[in-house]
């Protein structure tokens, strides 16, 4: 059986912020896999190189984005690329024909950060797919009264937004 795709993600982030040697190696891997007819799906908190568009449009390239508030990023994702830079790089790839997606997880509760999910959705309204999921295994989330209803409401908002903008979506089980 032939490998259908390889998923490169943040557990060993293929495009670590401020790590050009990792980014270069990841680009080489994508290129090699694509030459063998293997699609790549990529997820990063780094900045996506523009040259990914040169490898073909069958790949699916995504970023993690759970906020657009830089104070939140500095506290919760201190080594990740600024949100605006992630979005800009992803949009560049999308405009060049690459399939793009957003992982909006782990999405925080209001006792962690008060924010309007519609602002985030509007910032990434160009993508082909949005994956949404709750923040798990966190005492602050567990302490938030009404968390189940909160995540249900947000899931409905994501679905409604995606339907009205022609975007595919996936809501993680248990959200």
Q: Which sequence ranges carry the predicted segments?
A:
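Conserved AdoMet/S-adenosylmethionine-binding subsite of the radical SAM
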Residues: 1-162
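C-terminal accessory regions of radical SAM enzymes
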Residues: 155-175
């Amino acid at each position: 059986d032939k490998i259908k795709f390889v998923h490169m993600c943040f557990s060993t982030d293929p495009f670590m912020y401020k790590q050009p040697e990792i980014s270069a190696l990841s680009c080489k891997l994508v290129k090699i896999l694509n030459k063998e007819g293997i699609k790549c799906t990529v997820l990063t908190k780094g900045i996506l190189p523009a040259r990914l568009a040169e490898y073909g449009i069958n790949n699916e390239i995504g970023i993690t984005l759970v906020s657009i508030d830089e104070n939140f990023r500095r506290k919760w994702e201190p080594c990740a690329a600024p949100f605006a830079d992630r979005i800009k790089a992803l949009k560049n790839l999308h405009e060049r024909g690459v399939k793009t997606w957003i992982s909006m997880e782990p999405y925080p509760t209001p006792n962690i950060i008060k924010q309007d999910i519609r602002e985030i959705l509007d910032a990434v309204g160009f993508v082909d797919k949005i994956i949404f999921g709750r923040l798990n295994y966190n005492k602050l989330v567990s302490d938030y009264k009404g968390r189940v209803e909160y995540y249900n409401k947000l899931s409905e908002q994501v679905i409604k937004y995606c339907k009205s903008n022609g975007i595919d979506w996936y809501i993680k089980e248990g959200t």
